[in-house]
């Protein structure tokens, strides 16, 4: 486990280890990336045990291009076990690359909605998918896929992650500080806002990538964002960084 120490403001590892039999089921000789738990990473294990929606989304490239997969999981005494075999989301996947699915719980009360990235139209853009009324996307026999134009650019827009009404993603569009930058957009109940660069306190002339935003609760001033960057000062290559960002 990773815990946050309120006294010294540091994240620390505990000795409470968990086994992820789930990962033994999804990992292959191919590339697996973009993991996403449907219960949005609650802080404490007893919250996990109360979760009703236990799906694990990720991407893999068994056919050469990235496709989105899902595997159900259940809670064991000390970890997570698969509750079935992984399966591809064939209604979403194409001959191009699809990945980094993130559920959008605030979009509709009776139709499950998610966002993901794809380069089906030439460059990477962020797409929205909606399932049938009253059904999960993974249960639907048909889905509606759209590309929100307000989020799109002529560059590559990738790795969307939604927490509450905020989406964070990475893009090498104009208006950044160089390479891939982190951007955010806010959902107003009907549409996404025009993306805003997260600024030079987070972004650099290097690449900032794959942001994950975690709502921190009422006791905290900021939400937690974790991302990767190949900026100088790390251990080499891409390293993980965390930062507090204002709640929106």
Label for each model-derived stretch:
Residues 1-248:
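Short, conserved micro-motifs composed of acidic
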